[in-house]
A protein has these predicted regions:
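Short, charge-dense linear interaction motifs
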Residues: 1-220
């Protein structure tokens, strides 16, 4: 019977974020479906015009999710029974814009969003421009850790490592994201700011990531 040893290695890396991901959400409700659809399209055009005025390609604003659903509300009838009535059509449009991490540019974008007539909700994330390279580095560290542990175990057990029989990795999504601005009041940025810009002074921490790989070796 073939003898094997199975060892799980853990990789850890710290990556400096170099990209800002701006998540933008628009939603509103209208009595007519056509009005909801038209208002959504018009609002997105306003945002694209705004970003275009800041020097970005209009196509840089990417749609993540779009939907229009019927909305109902509960009410109490004269006989005290609860009923539902049609409220309207609610659209939800979620988008993102990614750009190189730059506090000055971020300040201009936040100022424009705060003074935008469509008043979108938004959040800010820091990430990396090349996540695949970071993932590969993370996997490499996990493999190295597995090999180091396997050699220690083999030496302690007085056996010799043979060929690798199997490498097991979940291939789950690894999202390199830092959120230093969980709560942001744009009013706090008003003081001493340039015209049409907020004074942002943000230095995001490195993104710490970990992942595991399980390797099976023959032993003799």
């Amino acid at each position: 019977m073939e003898r094997t040893i199975r060892v799980t290695g853990k990789g850890n890396i710290s990556v400096k974020p170099d990209t800002i991901r701006l998540r933008i959400s628009l939603e509103d409700i209208f009595r007519e479906y056509d009005d909801a659809l038209r208002h959504s399209a018009d609002s997105v055009e306003l945002l694209k015009d705004m970003f275009g005025g800041l020097g970005y390609d209009r196509k840089a604003l990417k749609t993540l999710y779009f939907n229009i659903n019927t909305e109902y509300e509960s009410y109490q009838d004269r006989d005290k029974s609860w009923k539902r009535r049609f409220k309207g059509y609610k659209y939800t449009h979620r988008m993102k814009l990614e750009f190189p991490a730059d506090n000055k540019q971020l300040g201009k974008i936040l100022y424009a969003l705060a003074h935008c007539p469509v008043s979108p909700e938004f959040s800010i994330e820091y990430t990396v421009a090349d996540p695949e390279a970071a993932k590969n580095e993370l996997l490499g560290e996990a493999i190295k850790d597995s090999m180091a542990k396997a050699n220690v175990l083999a030496t302690a057990a007085n056996v010799k490592l043979g060929n690798i029989v199997n490498i097991d990795y979940s291939w789950g999504e690894v999202d390199f994201v830092s959120k230093p601005l969980e709560e942001l009041s744009l009013r706090c940025c008003e003081d001493a700011c340039e015209p049409a810009s907020y004074n942002m002074d943000i230095e995001p921490d490195d993104i710490d990531m970990a992942d595991t790989v399980t390797v099976v070796w023959n032993i003799a």
